[in-house]
Amino acid sequence: SSKDSKQLDAEVHRKYIYGGHVAAYMNILMEDEPEKYQSHFSSYIKADLAPDNIEEMYKKVHAAIRPDPSPKKSQKQPPKTHKRYNLKKLTYEERKAKLIERLNALNAAGGNDDDDEEDDE
């Protein structure tokens, strides 16, 4: 087994670098499960990538990386601000002000008969 000998097989390595394993898998899926191939490799199909031109694509990509290895900035959409379902906690002062506001509203609505609880006896 090659694991023990720690020897790097150049041909195998080359195959992986150029996506040979992907191309092989694409061929297997094409023959055995065409619908799975369609869904699994939909972006490849859109990009017009077939198993036989994957190696070409990788060679082009590698050739393009060599002159300028710095990653290209892609145009990303700015993240959307998410709606907060849990409201921010109010400070003690804000809670106190709200309570006073509620009490005032209750008193105004109740016509200021604060002592009606004692009259029920």
From Swiss-Prot:
It comes from the Eukaryota. GO terms for molecular function: 5S rRNA binding; structural constituent of ribosome. Residues 73-87 have a biased composition (Basic residues). It is found in: Cytoplasm; Nucleus. Its main location: cytoplasm. Keywords: Cytoplasm, Nucleus, Ribonucleoprotein, Ribosomal protein. Pfam families: Ribosomal_L18_c. One of its GO terms (biological process) is ribosomal large subunit assembly. One of its GO terms (cellular component) is cytosolic large ribosomal subunit. Residues 63-88 are annotated as: Disordered. The keyword ATP-binding does not apply. InterPro entries: Rbsml_uL18_euk, Ribosomal_uL18_C_euk. Component of the ribosome, a large ribonucleoprotein complex responsible for the synthesis of proteins in the cell. The small ribosomal subunit (SSU) binds messenger RNAs (mRNAs) and translates the encoded message by selecting cognate aminoacyl-transfer RNA (tRNA) molecules. The large subunit (LSU) contains the ribosomal catalytic site termed the peptidyl transferase center (PTC), which catalyzes the formation of peptide bonds, thereby polymerizing the amino acids delivered by tRNAs into a polypeptide chain. PANTHER family: LARGE RIBOSOMAL SUBUNIT PROTEIN UL18 C-TERMINAL EUKARYOTES DOMAIN-CONTAINING PROTEIN, RIBOSOMAL PROTEIN L5-RELATED. Component of the large ribosomal subunit (LSU). This is Large ribosomal subunit protein uL18.
